[in-house]
Regions:
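Conserved active-site segment immediately N-terminal to the catalytic lysine
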Residues: 1-8, 23, 68-69
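Glycine-rich phosphate-binding loop of ATP-grasp-fold ATP-dependent ligases
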Residues: 9-14
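PLP-dependent aminotransferase class I/II
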Residues: 17-223
Length: 223
């Protein structure tokens, strides 16, 4: 199940117009450092703050380099030049990737729509041109999903949950809010799953997906 359109390894992005949020985010990805010099500013002898070597820690009567003051508990999440180079090369192919994903999604949609009862498919808006991450399948019940997912997996077609669904039902987040306030997210957790539409699917792979779905239909009819 290759899901992502392109990859540069692990990573992500934070976007904000709030300078305080930007500064904190930069600190978190850089070991929790207090220094906010960016790019060529890292080469300035006195730093962006103009007081790089100062008494930064209360109670200590000597100067410390601001680049080595840690104001937050942070992480080492800085992207590598190699990751950027890989991403740039993949961006050159993004139009082809987008086109093939749309073609594959349309084909797989039809396989499910023509053969499987108890499901709904996700359609894009009239003016949209979605670059599909996968093929979302909405089932009429948890039982329908469990049965269909099990059959696909047993026949070597990988599936994925629709991410967390309602994150508030998960152990790490259950104390944050009342999950019942978000009924749509609960439905997603209970009834929705993905199959892939990666552009790397060959014609024979697409045909195999169709064959498995047809066999599922026949197996249901014979019970």
């Amino acid at each position: 199940y290759p899901a992502h359109h392109i990859t540069t390894g692990e990573g992500g992005m934070v976007s904000s117009k709030n300078e305080d949020i930007i500064e904190i985010a930069r600190s978190f990805v850089n070991w929790g450092r207090d220094c906010y010099c960016v790019g060529s500013a890292n080469l300035l002898p006195r730093g962006t703050c103009k007081k790089r070597f100062s008494k930064w820690i209360p109670g200590l009567d000597f100067a410390i380099d601001h680049k080595y003051i840690f104001s937050n508990i942070g992480y080492n999440l800085k992207p590598l030049d190699l990751q950027g180079a890989i991403g740039i090369e993949q961006l050159k192919k993004i139009s082809k990737i987008h086109k093939k994903r749309r073609i594959n999604k349309k084909k797989i949609d039809k396989f499910f729509e023509d053969n499987i009862d108890g499901i709904r498919l996700v359609r894009e808006g009239e003016k949209a041109e979605t670059s599909w991450f996968g093929v979302p399948i909405i089932c009429d019940s948890a039982e329908t999903r469990a049965k269909l997912v099990s059959y696909l997996e047993e026949n070597r077609i990988q599936t994925r949950m629709y991410f967390a669904g309602n994150i508030l039902l998960h152990p790490g987040y259950k104390e944050l809010d009342d999950a019942s306030k978000y009924p749509n997210a609960n439905q997603v957790l209970e009834k929705v799953f993905f199959v892939g539409c990666t552009p790397t699917y060959s014609d024979s792979m697409i045909s195999y997906i169709e064959e498995v779905i047809l066999n599922y239909k026949l197996s249901c009819a014979n019970k």
